[in-house]
Amino acid sequence: SEMVESGELDAKYVHVESEHSARCCAMGASATGARAFTATSSQGLLYMAEVLTYAAGGRFPIVMMNANRSTALPWNIYGDQRDSLSLLDHGWIQCYAQDNQEALDMALMAYRLAEDPRVMTPVMVNLDGFALTHTYETVEVPTPEQADAFLPPYATTNKFDFDHPVNMGYSAGPEHNRYYKY
C-alpha cells in the first residue's frame, strides 16, 4: 500500500471489509482484464474458501500470497500448512516457498503461469507464517526492466466484453461437471 500511495507502483489498492470481499474484488478486477493480487492467511483463507472455487471455475488468473498459519482452535500465529492443504481440491495451483527470496520470485512466476493462455488458473503462493512473514531476510528485488522482461504485459481474452457477452456462473449437469473441474 505504501508503494501505491507513493506512486512507485501503478496499481489500485482497495480496502475491503473481509477476506471474502477481497477475493470477490480480485475476481471482479480480473474479469475486467486487470492483473489482480491479494493476500491472506489462516482463518482468512478458510473464510474466502467459498469464492476460491468461483475464481478457479471462471479461469481468473489471480495471484494470492498466503502466509501459512495454524487454524483455530487453539489460536496461534505460527507456521502450519493446514490452511492451504485443506483447499487442495479448490482448483488453485499451489506453490510453497522455502524462503523470502523464493516467495518474491514465485509471485512473478505465479503471474506468468496463471496468465498463460494454456493454463488460465489462479495461483496461491504459500510461505511459512511467522518464520518468513515476521522476520527480515535480504532479498534481491528485480528491477522493473527485469520484471517486465520476464513477465509480458497482461493481455487476456478471458474478460467481460460488452460487445460480445457470455454467460458466467452457469450450471453444469453431471455429464459436464467433470470436464469443468478436471
Label each PLM-derived region with a short phrase:
Residues 1-86, 91-92, 108-109, 128:
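Thiamine diphosphate
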Residues 78-129, 153-154:
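Conserved thiamine diphosphate
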Residues 13, 47, 54, 78, ...:
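Sequence-level detector for tyrosine residue identity
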Residues 11, 92-95, 137-142:
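Short, exposed beta-strand "edge-strand" segments with a Pro/Gly-rich flavor and a Y/T-containing core
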Residues 123-182:
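Conformationally flexible catalytic loops at phosphate/diphosphate-handling active centers
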